[in-house]
């Protein structure tokens, strides 16, 4: 069994697990934990210095779970402190602020940091990840929509929740699902449960939706060079349409991506003789 897994327990027995939080500074990691554990919201921002540690007990089905929570500082300055806490982890709360695109874009870097610190023998497949799209109460400042965040999470087999530490929305549901998944992981010999969402669309579909969403124009969206012929434009459009048609693709954002492809084709063909 992998090093990050606790010893397998019989049903009904207590279980001890380690959970860490990851994400940029000021995305609300500490506030999410406080909202769940202490049922309160701290409006004044207090930066986490290095690591905050806490213990809580929860019950999942007929088991008592002792949860050791390591709330890790998101500022790069504290890398030398937090890099000691990645190992022997069963669950990760990965947080970004829906009003800060850079905090969403940084999620891949956080995963890379964890993978680096776990080393060649570490296995991130034996860890439950939950992605929290936090601060959804700040609707006016939102710049990362739900479909974009959900696509990123589900394409990696991660859980995904929309949360607000301020109002409490999504917090309890997130933690309950998170802990149940960790218990299932432990009882399944360290194998991450396969979610329906992670198996419902392909990496090719997810990559295509992300590329379309981030494209800089119609040529870029279809993946053809400026000045391409009508046949080349139609061929590129057909390929993407088959891949992303809403009747066949259930990936978050597929319907909008499909419409964008059709509109891009129409716009380009107007200017091609």
UniProtKB/Swiss-Prot annotation:
GO BP terms: phagosome-lysosome fusion
Start and end residues of each stretch annotated as Required for interaction with MAPK1: 1-18
InterPro entries on file: DnaJ_domain, J_dom_sf, P-loop_NTPase, Small_GTP-bd, Small_GTPase
GO cellular component terms listed in the entry, alphabetical order: late endosome; lysosome; nucleus; phagocytic vesicle
Residues of the J domain: 217-273
Compartment(s): Nucleus
Binding-site positions, GTP: 23-30, 71-75, 134-137
PROSITE patterns reported in the protein's UniProt record: DNAJ_2, RAB
Pfam (any one): Ras
Keywords: GTP-binding, Nucleotide-binding, Nucleus
Main subcellular localisation: nucleus
UniProt cross-references to CDD domains, sorted A to Z: DnaJ, RJL
Intrachain disulfide bonds: none
Entry's Gene Ontology molecular function annotations: GTP binding; GTPase activity
Membrane-traversing stretches: none
Protein function: GTPase which can activate the MEK/ERK pathway and induce cell transformation when overexpressed. May act as a nuclear scaffold for MAPK1, probably by association with MAPK1 nuclear export signal leading to enhanced ERK1/ERK2 signaling.
Family (UniProt): Belongs to the small GTPase superfamily. Rab family.
NCBIfam families reported in the protein's UniProt record: small_GTP
Subunit comment: Interacts directly with MAPK1 (wild-type and kinase-deficient forms). Interacts directly (in GTP-bound form) with MAP2K1 (wild-type and kinase-deficient forms).
Protein name: DnaJ homolog subfamily C member 27
UniProt organism field: Pongo abelii (Sumatran orangutan)
